[in-house]
Regions:
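Amide-forming acyltransferase catalytic core, primarily the GNAT-like/NAT-type
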Residues: 1-89, 94-95
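Active-site/acyl-donor-binding loops of N-acyltransferases
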Residues: 1-13, 89-98, 102-159
Length: 159
């Protein structure tokens, strides 16, 4: 996972042409899969995304569909506390991430923003890689396949 911590002064103003809308689990999951298509990743059922939606809403945030310059992305956002927002996953092309974060900041004012994106995406300047999750194989054939591609995206942590 690539992580980034931002203060409000580091976030550009939102573009009025862009949009952030709260969305349901099935729509979120469809956008998520489209954004991650072709890459190695953990796939979640709509039920697990619904669980994440509940966690996000309990904190005062939610699951969002993001539109920037004709591209549709998504973000799972939670308040960690009243001053900190965690974007558990931001899935939109790196070229549009800055504008997506600006939309999140307008919707969820905070003193600090933590943003997670897939490790293989360049993302925003200042991001760093942090291993997230662990895989233990009990099937040697599948373990051999994994060795060919060790960079995979787990995404949501149900914490």
């Amino acid at each position: 996972t690539r992580k980034l911590e931002l203060l409000p002064a580091m976030i550009s103003p939102a573009n009025r042409a862009d949009a952030l809308e709260q969305t349901g689990a099935a729509v979120y999951n469809r956008i998520r899969e489209a954004q991650l298509e072709g890459g190695s990743r953990v796939r979640y059922s709509d039920d697990l995304i619904e669980y994440q939606k509940g966690l996000a809403e309990l904190s005062g945030a939610g699951l969002y569909q993001i539109s920037v310059e004709g591209e549709t992305g998504c973000a799972a956002v939670e308040y960690v506390d009243r001053d900190s927002v965690l974007c558990k996953e931001l899935l939109i092309s790196p070229a549009h991430m800055e504008r997506a974060v600006a939309l999140i900041a307008v919707r969820h004012p905070a003193r600090r923003y933590h943003v997670r994106t897939p490790a293989c995406w360049e993302g925003l300047p200042g991001g760093y890689l942090q291993p997230f999750g662990m895989v233990k194989w009990y099937n040697r054939d599948k373990e051999a396949l994994w060795a060919a591609c060790t960079h995979s995206y787990m995404g949501l942590g149900f914490d």
